Regions:
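Central regulatory/effector-binding core of bacterial HTH transcription factors
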Residues: 1-3, 71, 153-157
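Thr-Gly-centered strand-to-loop micro-motif
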Residues: 20, 44-45, 67, 90
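Generic preference for hydrophobic
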Residues: 17-18, 41, 106, 120, ...
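C-terminal effector-binding regulatory domain of bacterial HTH transcription factors
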Residues: 92-101, 111-157
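Hydrophobic hinge/microswitch elements
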Residues: 50-107
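Short beta-strand->loop
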Residues: 6-16, 101-114
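Flexible hinge/capping segments at coil-to-helix
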Residues: 3-41
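Secondary-structure junction motif
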Residues: 25-26, 40-61, 128-130, 136, ...
């Protein structure tokens, strides 16, 4: 990163491959990405960084990412998986409750998905505005200062 820009890692996370109940048998197997391509895939749209990430991940294994269904937001993926429309990569935190309820199944991969990060890039020559500071604090696990609070709504599923 070139000065005066600075990058702060706000959060790291892992994504896992999941499928609906009809894919339960796959939950006891370890699949290669080539085998995953034999099943319908659900993915975020081509204009997203997530799509680019998985496109590169597949290319590193000499494969092309060819999802059957593309969606606009991550929260649209889980209902499609639950309704048996295909396999998908989801952040562990989003998938864990549905896995615990046996609504979906986690599918192991021979080559695990690399860890991802949520980063904030900012210009060190300019101070962060109040909403940006508050969002940064929330993501880093801090709290919003009451006297300086702003209207930030964070929705968790």
């Amino acid at each position: 990163m070139k000065p005066p820009l600075k990058k702060i890692v706000l959060q790291s996370f892992r994504e896992i491959l999941v499928g609906g109940k009809t894919f339960t048998a796959l939950g006891s197997q370890v699949l290669s990405l080539a085998e995953v391509k034999n099943y319908p895939m659900i993915c975020l749209g081509r204009e997203t960084m997530t799509y680019q990430f998985y496109s590169q991940f597949f290319l590193k294994h000499c494969l092309e990412l060819t999802p059957d269904t593309e969606v606009a937001t991550t929260d649209q993926i889980l209902p499609l998986v639950k309704n048996e429309l295909g396999l998908a990569f989801l952040p562990e935190k989003i998938a864990e409750e549905a896995i615990a309820r046996h609504e979906i199944v986690q599918i192991a991969l021979q080559d695990p998905v690399p860890e991802r990060q949520i980063c904030m890039v900012y210009d060190v020559e300019h101070s962060l505005n109040a909403p940006t500071r508050q969002l940064k604090n929330l993501i880093l696990g801090g709290s919003v200062e009451p006297e300086k609070s702003v209207d930030i709504r964070v929705y968790k599923k």
